Amino acid sequence: MIDTFHTKVLQAKNKDEVREMASLTKMMTAIVSLELAEEMRLDIRTTYFKVSYKACTTIGTTANTVDGQVMTIWELLHGLMLPSGNDAAMVLAENFSNRLILNANRSAKEEEKVIEVPKCSFYPFVK
């Protein structure tokens, strides 16, 4: 339990257990993709990205993308968040490239300052 007003941890279960970031990376990918689309003045409903072979063969949970398929950012965000599609995350990352990594790391660094949880590190979010 976190006191968001004072940004303090009040109670924690298994607080020293190291956990994978898993879907947190997908949430960060979605947030940063939306920020980048806005910054670049891209309409997420009419801007299309092409699915690469690398993206559609990414291991893990999938949005069932197909090599060569063309999808809007909106569709990719749905594929990213609803079935937790690693393939959709890869398409967004490939198309936003280094900007996505830089913005994700910047956001993670900012969050780390706000959420002062011992032994917790969000930064660097992407190496």
Label each residue range with its predicted role.
Residues 1-127:
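Active-site-adjacent loops and short helices of periplasmic peptidoglycan-processing enzymes
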